[in-house]
Amino acid sequence: MTSNYFEYNKAKVIQALRYHFISRKEIKIMIVLINVFAILSATLFFFKKISPLAFLLSSFLWFVMMILFWFLLPRIIYKKSSSFKDRFKINLNDATFSLEHERASRSFNWTEFDSWMESPHFFHLYFNATSFFLIPKDAFENEGEQEARNYFKEKIKK
């Protein structure tokens, strides 16, 4: 199965990178801990057990973390990666996943992938926790998206 040539849409890529960051286990744990800390400090501030400064610091920490993971990190990654500005074509078959660029191509065995995830506009194919491909769903025509999903389910064990 072969996709059309595709280009990345900046807004959709940034949204996909947000999904990537928020789906990481360590970031989920950090978000939960900071939210618990913020709720605890708000409660203690309400009952006048802590000073306003402690409450402001916990609120500031929460805002910084949300701005970092929701706005800054996705944009930084997008700007640093030149591949989001190129055109690609993929080919899926029983043995390999092939990525074709206008100047070169590369094939990967399915066993090289660690896991995969689906977000609203992309399939995320992971080599490890930090290295992955974003494959736009709109690169496939008609039933191609479902075919690709079936390949990923069959070939990449989550």
Where are these regions (language model features)?
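Phosphoinositide-dependent membrane-docking surfaces
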Residues: 97, 106-123
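Hydrophobic alpha-helical transmembrane segments
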Residues: 49-62
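Juxtamembrane "helix-exit" motif on the non-cytosolic side of transmembrane helices
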Residues: 41-50
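Conserved beta-hairpin
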Residues: 67-107
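Alpha-helical transmembrane spans of integral membrane proteins, capturing the lipid-embedded, hydrophobic core
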Residues: 34-38, 59-63, 67
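N-terminal membrane-targeting/pre-transmembrane regions
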Residues: 1-40
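Generic beta-strand structural signal
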Residues: 91-92, 118, 127
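A membrane-cytosol interface segment of integral membrane proteins
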Residues: 124-158
